[in-house]
Amino acid sequence: MVPISVTIEREHPSIGIITLVGEHDAYSAGRIANEIEVLLDTGLPVVIDLTEATFVDSQTLSTLLSARHQAHAANLGFTLVLPDDRFTQVHRILRMTGLASWFATYPSMTEARDAARAGHTSGGRLKVA
């Protein structure tokens, strides 16, 4: 099973953090969608930590994009953590698909948490080249 961890930080306001490690494809996309749905249904902003993710396929991207739209509609933050100190397959995929600008993506957990708590769902500081 591909590692996915879910953490709820109880600082005010509370926030849900989902950490993805390794490669994620259609096999794990369903579980990711379920975890995000639980957090959004609870009214929590969501941070997806992609720091240790090495690959995400189109199904996983679709899951993240759908969740971003759900969060936006519910006025909840939805951000991604993707450090810019190394260029990964995830960076490349976001750039190639043109989806980089659709997500609020930040190079550090601190920035992503703050932005999610502020209700951000797009923008951010992702470097894609």
Where are these regions (language model features)?
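STAS-like cytosolic regulatory interaction modules
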Residues: M1-E52, S66-A129
